[in-house]
């Protein structure tokens, strides 16, 4: 394996960590209605658990509510049950044609808890990025030991890997900071 491959693998792992962080943070709710909040809801559609977005149209008429219009009125009850079973803490209002969801206001205490949760998720992402760096540096040391690359090339590769690591940690911090700001903003 060449140094370029080691760098590429490390960068791919870090990229994957950043994407994973973004997905994880989508699940942490802010005080505003965002369609991504409902991504985890699975509806029993003719015996098959299907994502809510595939069985209904989801819109946000205002910042604090959802309007869910199923493609088939027959599955309205199933959608309602799926929402109740989810851990969103929202009570669906079924009028026979559509379901309305009100996003409850977050208390100050809940906002702080969510901000702590964001920090914890971000720290896990930082650790994953550092582990990718460590794995890459171990590969470089192995290449040096096997005399596949010179010591100077190894040092340069480690410096490049460190630079990529620093960039990804900055990106992780930026994503987490944006989410925290969204949570703490009333």
UniProtKB/Swiss-Prot annotation:
Q: Name one GO cellular component term.
A: cytoplasm
Positions of the region Disordered? Answer: 135-156
InterPro entries per record: Ribosome_recyc_fac, Ribosome_recyc_fac_dom, RRF_sf
A Gene Ontology BP annotation from the UniProt entry? translational termination
Q: State its location(s).
A: Cytoplasm
Q: Which Pfam family name is an example for this entry?
A: RRF
- Keyword Cytoplasm: yes or no? yes
Keyword entries, A-Z? Cytoplasm, Protein biosynthesis
GO MF annotations in UniProt? ribosomal large subunit binding
Q: Which PANTHER family match?
A: MITOCHONDRIAL RIBOSOME RECYCLING FACTOR PSEUDO 1 (PTHR20982:SF3), RIBOSOME RECYCLING FACTOR (PTHR20982)
Q: What does this protein do?
A: Responsible for the release of ribosomes from messenger RNA at the termination of protein biosynthesis. May increase the efficiency of translation by recycling ribosomes from one round of translation to another.
Similarity section: Belongs to the RRF family.
Q: Which HAMAP family match?
A: RRF
Name used for this protein in its record: Ribosome-recycling factor
Q: Which organism is it from?
A: Bdellovibrio bacteriovorus (strain ATCC 15356 / DSM 50701 / NCIMB 9529 / HD100)
């Amino acid at each position: 394996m060449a140094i370029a491959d080691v760098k590429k693998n490390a960068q791919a792992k870090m990229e994957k960590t950043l994407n994973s962080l973004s997905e994880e943070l989508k699940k942490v709710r802010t005080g505003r209605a965002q369609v991504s909040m409902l991504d985890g809801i699975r509806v029993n559609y003719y015996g098959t658990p299907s994502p809510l977005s595939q069985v209904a149209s989801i819109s946000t008429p205002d910042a604090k509510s959802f309007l869910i219009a199923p493609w088939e009125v027959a599955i309205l009850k199933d959608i309602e049950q799926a929402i109740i079973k989810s851990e969103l803490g929202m009570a669906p209002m079924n009028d026979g044609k559509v379901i309305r969801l009100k996003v409850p206001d977050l208390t100050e205490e809940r906002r702080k808890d969510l901000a702590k949760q964001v920090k914890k998720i971000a720290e896990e992402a930082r650790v994953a990025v550092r582990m990718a760096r460590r794995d890459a540096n171990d590969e470089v040391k192995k290449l040096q030991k096997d005399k596949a690359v010179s010591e100077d090339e190894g040092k340069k590769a480690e410096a490049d890997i460190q630079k990529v690591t620093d960039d990804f940690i900055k990106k992780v911090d930026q994503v987490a900071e944006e989410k925290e700001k969204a949570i703490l903003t009333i």
